[in-house]
Amino acid sequence: MTAVRVYRDDGPLSRALGRTAGGRLPPLPFTVLAAAATGVLLAVGPQPGTRIGPEPAVFAPLVVLLLAGPASDHPHTGRLDWLVPPILRGIEYGYLAVLGDARAVPVPLVYVLLTVLALHHYDAAYRTRQGRRPPRWVRLAGLGWEGRMLFTAFAGLLAPLPFAYAALAAYLGVLSGGESAATWARHGRAGGVMVDLTKKLSEGVGDGPHGEREKRA
């Protein structure tokens, strides 16, 4: 899997559609089309201050999934295919921000969710550049961009949307934050240099001009 495909952060649904298409669909045109469709659906709904319902914005995640998902198995080796992940981030972040604003989700809660997502994506990108890609189970458990969008869209049908935002932020924070901290701690112990400070300090008494004076004393 190429780094660009890792940066996409596809979930199980998008990956399944990608395998069905067999990697034959070019990713960039369909992702741009998905972004345009999301913008249109958000522009016509939801209406501010109303409960989420059968409005066009509810179906935006499904439309994006059907457009961008089938291209997820493409190797993304085209000259401009590196644009696909940031466009998907813009779709996801923009959808969550606009939907939260329209559904009266507290601004701090929207900010927390977007911050958790940004840290999740930054960690995945940094680890990939270091040759330590997140394990497959973490990528699947993270639901992917499509799973998170679908969750927030349809969870509002069963409960107030702030609860969905809070639950998603807490879940991703524990999953990504805990696994990331454990991974870096494990690699730090494996690849770091162990220093015996007590020994170093005792040896340091004889080092340098001050140490020489202490030795002579």
Segments (PLM) and residue ranges:
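Helix-to-loop junctions at the C-terminal end of transmembrane segments
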Residues: 72-78
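Hydrophobic alpha-helical transmembrane segments
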Residues: 1-70, 82, 86-128, 133-217
